């Protein structure tokens, strides 16, 4: 579960390293974001000479959460960190590589490009 002021790791090579959640998109009173949800975030740490700079306001999709997510078959999946992938307005990743596993829930949310770039889908 991601809410306002949550710090996330970045799971792509866009150049950002840490994101700070500013807003959860999808309704005026929406409080939490889960896997596959889009957030508005500020870049808190970034590599030099990268596509995104420190202080940039970007959109990101949540790909891993430390809070367990229930699946229809009764199983749960959770990760060690909260992570996101920086996306553009067309919902495509800014980076060209994805690091670490991503959850299968992204497929239902139509993030096929992220699924195809990820080394593992759990």
Curated annotation (Swiss-Prot):
One BP term from GO: translation
NCBIfam families with a match to the protein in the record: rplN_bact
Cellular-component GO terms for this entry: cytosolic large ribosomal subunit
GO molecular function, one term: structural constituent of ribosome
Family, as annotated: Belongs to the universal ribosomal protein uL14 family.
HAMAP family from the UniProt entry: Ribosomal_uL14
Role noted for this protein: Binds to 23S rRNA. Forms part of two intersubunit bridges in the 70S ribosome.
Protein name, UniProt field: Large ribosomal subunit protein uL14
Annotated InterPro entries: Ribosomal_uL14, Ribosomal_uL14_bac-type, Ribosomal_uL14_CS, Ribosomal_uL14_sf
Keywords assigned: Ribonucleoprotein, Ribosomal protein, RNA-binding, rRNA-binding
Signal peptide bounds: none
Complex and partners: Part of the 50S ribosomal subunit. Forms a cluster with proteins L3 and L19. In the 70S ribosome, L14 and L19 interact and together make contacts with the 16S rRNA in bridges B5 and B8.
